[in-house]
């Protein structure tokens, strides 16, 4: 009877291990997909930031456009 209990426990552990391996693989696929999506979003954010900076003129005049201070 103890052998049956031991075999049942071993079968239960093997079953749990199999389900855990499947879950780990599914999570790995999900994490990998999220990493790729985040990389795309970072690229889009960088491009949008560059476009925004290029479309908005700076309120600070360049050194050549600045008038000299009054003490010159």
Swiss-Prot record:
PANTHER family: PROTEIN SLYX
Full protein name: Protein SlyX
Similarity field: Belongs to the SlyX family.
Region of interest called Disordered, as start-end residue ranges on this chain: 52-72
InterPro entries xref list: SlyX
Lineage, uppermost ranks: Bacteria, Pseudomonadati, Pseudomonadota, Gammaproteobacteria, Enterobacterales
Pfam families recorded: SlyX (PF04102)
Compositionally biased intervals (Polar residues): 55-65
